[in-house]
Design a protein with these regions (language model features):
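Mid-chain, well-packed structural core segment of small domains
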Residues: 67-92
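Structural signature of tandem alpha-helical TPR/SEL1-like repeats
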Residues: 19-28, 53-66, 88-100, 125-129
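Alpha-helical adaptor scaffolds
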Residues: 11-18, 27-76
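Alpha-solenoid helical repeat scaffolds
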Residues: 10-11, 41-45, 76-80, 96, ...
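Short, structured secondary-structure boundary patches
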Residues: 47-48, 64, 99-101, 115-117
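Intrinsically disordered, low-complexity, charge-biased linker/tail regions
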Residues: 1-11, 15-18, 69, 103, ...
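Amphipathic alpha-helical segments within well-ordered protein domains
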Residues: 30, 48, 82-83, 98-102
Length: 155
């Protein structure tokens, strides 16, 4: 019986969160979490709600990180943790989290979109030309590949 109530509270909390009401979502998600403290979905969305409603970045990040440690097979857990990191100003951690998600799930549109929102765009390779000019696009992609390869070799 507690599971059904927890699931109902969770679904209601997520709906409130998605509708831009983190303050109202927080008690629902908290009640779901109290029923099942190791449920990664409850942990992740409670963390996201705490971040949005209370701006308690450390607590929110810990909850989202725990969810991801328990279950790495849900793209939404990467998205929630990345949002918490980005909101707290930890852009590098957010990008690292999204990259890990993209590596695990391939070309997931939600992860790609979140990464685009978080990343800072570099200035065009040739500033005199527009960002959409074919030379800037080709050289930018080449530079990105080279820098990605260098980062991979460092680790």
């Amino acid at each position: 019986m507690a599971e059904v109530d927890a699931l109902g509270e969770f679904k209601h909390g997520v709906a409130l969160l998605n509708n831009g009401n983190p303050d109202l979502a927080l008690p629902c998600l908290w009640r779901a979490f109290e029923c099942e403290r190791l449920n990664p979905s409850y942990l992740s969305f409670l963390g996201l709600s705490i971040a949005r409603a209370q701006r308690e970045w450390d607590q929110a990040a810990r909850l989202c990180e725990m969810a991801l440690q328990i279950n790495r097979n849900e793209a939404v857990f990467y998205l929630n943790l990345a949002e918490v990191y980005a909101s707290s100003g930890s852009r590098a951690k957010a990008l690292k989290t999204l990259d890990a998600g993209l590596e695990k799930f391939g070309d997931d549109d939600r992860l790609r979109g979140a990464r685009r929102k978080v990343e800072k765009r570099r200035s065009p390779f040739i500033p005199l030309l527009s960002r959409n000019h074919f030379l800037n696009r080709k050289l930018g992609k080449w530079l990105h590949k080279v820098s990605k390869r260098k980062r991979k070799n460092k680790t």
